[in-house]
Amino acid sequence: MGEFTQKRLVRKLELELFLAKVAPQPKPQAHLEQYTVSEQLAANMLYIAAYTNDDIIGKSVLDLGCGTGRLALGAAFLGAENVVGIDIDRLAIKTARENTTHPHLADKVEWVNGDIDIISGKFDTVVQNPPFGVQTREADRAFLVKALEVGDVVYSLHNHPEADERLIKMLKSSKGFLQVEPSPFMQRFIYKHGGAIQAVYALPMTIPKMFDFHKKVRHDFIIDLYVIRKIANQSTSVSAPRYPTGKHL
């Protein structure tokens, strides 16, 4: 699955090409909201974590709801010290193991089939693409709570609070991302569970028609990447920071 890399700058295109070889979920289940992120979105997410914030290289990384391993393997490829990926879907974990073809990556990645509740211990970084909470209400919240319980920093994908066709077109044309403000609800919820939002990035995401209830051939929408730091002092102010808008990063 490409050349093993560690502790060197990896070009984003090189990362995308690596991630494109990670096979997606062969039999996605609607109730688990198993939507695979594109290699472009995953590369942007991991690039921010690795090179903007130095949260991947040499770190212990946990991928909650890892699916077939795109984020977990990407973190290992970029130079994480060790990676754990967990998913409740047995077939997803089987596919993730099959995706781990490079021996150097296999030595540093562990796959776990089970509910996220079984995870304990401490990790430097958590990356996750949790269920959006459409099929099972508030499903994403359990992932956030667990991530903040075991991780020092969390990179988590969530639905943008509103549809914005103009922003979607802007993001798709630039193939990049924009820094935006967090939703008030997310800010309160994250603080309640011991975290503070460092930044929020809007990224474009596309879901093809996968299930019977999907009405469109493809659905373009915005996904928000939340970068969250665990805080020791709950009295820390988490009033919404003023993020720059209209700027491609």
Predicted regions: what is each one?
Residues G65:
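Conserved glycine-centered beta->alpha loop in an early N-terminal alpha/beta scaffold
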Residues W111-D224:
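S-adenosylmethionine
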Residues D212-V238, R242:
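Core SAM-dependent methyltransferase catalytic element
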Residues I93-K94, D164:
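Short alpha-helix immediately C-terminal to the canonical SAM-binding loop
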